[in-house]
Amino acid sequence: MADVMRVAVAGASGYAGGEILRLLLGHPAYAQGRLTIGAVTAAASAGSPLGEHHPHLTPLAQRVLEPTDAAVLAGHDVVFLALPHGHSAALADQLGADTLIVDCGADFRLTDAAAWERFYGAPHAGSWPYGLPELPGARERLRGARRIAVPGCYPTAALLALLPAMAEDLIEPAVTVVAVSGTSGAGRAAKTDLLGSEVIGSARAYNIAGAHRHTPEIAQGLAAVSGRDVTVSFTPVLIPTSRGILATCTARTTAPLSALRAAYEKTYDAEPFIYLMPEGQLPRTGAVIGSNAAHIAVAVDEAAGVLVAIAAIDNLVKGTAGAAVQSMNLALGWPETQGLSVIGVAP
C-alpha cells in the first residue's frame, strides 16, 4: 500500500461525487496527509471550476474539472466512480488491477445477468463485492478488495430494515417496501418533473409495480441472507425535500415483538452506524441528514400479523457516499468509521 493514497473522483460535479469529496475532506487520513485528492472529473462540466458546482467545498473550489477518461484516472490508488449506470464498466476495464475502484453506480451490483439485462437493457458487466458492510460476511469480502459495488440508496434502507428478521426466518419471504425519498436521489441533471414548481407541495409515486430498478437488488440481498427466494413489492415515492429516505417495510409474521427485537438487537448491537430505536420511538429523516447512520424501528401489527420495520437514512451518505467511504476504509485496512459521523444535522 502506498504511504500516501492518491484518490480520484469521477462524476465530481454531481451530488454523489460532491458528497464523496465532502467526506474525504473531513477524513482523518486527509488531515494527516495520508490521503490526497487528485483528479476530479466530469463530462459536460469538464473545464469548469469545482466551486461552480459545489460552493460548499471551499478547499477544492479552484480545482478545474477534468474530462472523465481512463488517462486522467490512471495512476491513482483509489478511484470513486459516481457515474450514471452503464458508464463504469468500460472505465474500470482500463484501470489497473491494483487500483481500488469504488463504483457508486449500478453496473456491478446484481449477480443475476438476466435481471440486469431486464431492468437496465444492456449486457451484464459482472458483479463485484457489495459495499454494505452490515450484511453477513460482507466485511470479509470487502477487506483487501480492489473492486467494490456500492449499493443503491433504496436497497440500503430496505435491507437494513429487514435483514435481522429475514436472516432469523421470522418473516415470510414476501415483503412490501414503500419508501419516500428526497429529490437528490434522482441526480442533478435537469428534468421537468424535478423542477421546484413541480416538486414543492407535492408527493409522487413513480416506477411502481415492480418497475423500479432497485427491486431486484432488494430481492437479491434478502435472498442472500435467508437462503430462500424472496418476492419484493416496491413503491418509491418522491417527496419535496432534498435529502433522506424513509423506508416502511412490511411482511407477514407469527413472531412476537420480543423475538423480533431480540433478533434486531443481536444483529445490530455492535454495528457502529445502526441505531435501533427504543420501543415507541420512530425514525425520521431529519435526524440522520449529513450522517452515515441508519435509524431503525420495529413493531408488530398484531391484528394483521405483520412486521413493520422502518429505516431512515441520508440517501447521499449511508445511501451512497458514506457507504463508499466506509467500504474504502475496509478495503484499505483502515478503521471503517473514519471520516464518517453518526450525528445528523437538525433541524
Curated annotation (Swiss-Prot):
Its EC number is 1.2.1.38. Pathway: Amino-acid biosynthesis; L-arginine biosynthesis; N(2)-acetyl-L-ornithine from L-glutamate: step 3/4. It catalyses: N-acetyl-L-glutamate 5-semialdehyde + phosphate + NADP(+) = N-acetyl-L-glutamyl 5-phosphate + NADPH + H(+). GO terms for biological process: L-arginine biosynthetic process. It comes from the Bacteria. Pfam families: Semialdhyde_dh, Semialdhyde_dhC_1. InterPro entries: AGPR_AS, AGPR_type-1, NAD(P)-bd_dom_sf, NAGSA_dehydrogenase, Semialdehyde_DH_NAD-bd. Disulfide bonds: none annotated. It is found in: Cytoplasm. PROSITE patterns: ARGC (PS01224). One of its GO terms (cellular component) is cytoplasm. Keywords: Amino-acid biosynthesis, Arginine biosynthesis, Cytoplasm, NADP, Oxidoreductase. The active site is at 153. GO terms for molecular function: N-acetyl-gamma-glutamyl-phosphate reductase activity; NAD binding; NADP+ binding. Belongs to the NAGSA dehydrogenase family. Type 1 subfamily. Catalyzes the NADPH-dependent reduction of N-acetyl-5-glutamyl phosphate to yield N-acetyl-L-glutamate 5-semialdehyde. This is N-acetyl-gamma-glutamyl-phosphate reductase. It comes from Mycobacterium avium (strain 104). The lineage of its organism: Bacteria, Bacillati, Actinomycetota, Actinomycetes, Mycobacteriales. The gene is argC.
